[in-house]
From Swiss-Prot:
Region called Disordered, residue ranges: 1-21
Record PROSITE patterns: RIBOSOMAL_L27
Family listed: Belongs to the bacterial ribosomal protein bL27 family.
The protein, known as: Large ribosomal subunit protein bL27
Organism from which the protein derives: Albidiferax ferrireducens (strain ATCC BAA-621 / DSM 15236 / T118) (Rhodoferax ferrireducens)
């Protein structure tokens, strides 16, 4: 017989790496075309003027300019715009 109990096993011991989501450029900041403004899951922020959306819902600038956060429509959806400099 063993004089110590077996070590056993566990079902834990793993974790996913951070996804680095969130707002990367804030209102009023000067950005260049192609710069990422928001990384998100789903459309918490919607693309507005001069803003594109990637397949993972990342919002990015289509032109050089200043970032502006507004709300749009009857549902007051948060929208990101880029005003040309």
């Amino acid at each position: 017989m063993a004089h110590k109990k077996g070590g056993g096993s566990t079902h834990n011991g793993r974790d996913s790496k951070p996804k680095m989501l969130g707002v990367k450029k804030f209102g009023g900041e000067l950005i260049s075309a192609g710069a990422i403004i928001v990384r998100q899951r789903g459309t918490k922020f919607h693309p507005g003027v001069n803003v594109g959306i990637g397949k993972d819902h990342t919002l990015f600038a289509l032109v050089d300019g200043h970032v502006a956060f507004t709300t749009k429509g009857a549902m007051n959806k948060p929208t990101v715009n880029v005003a040309t400099a």
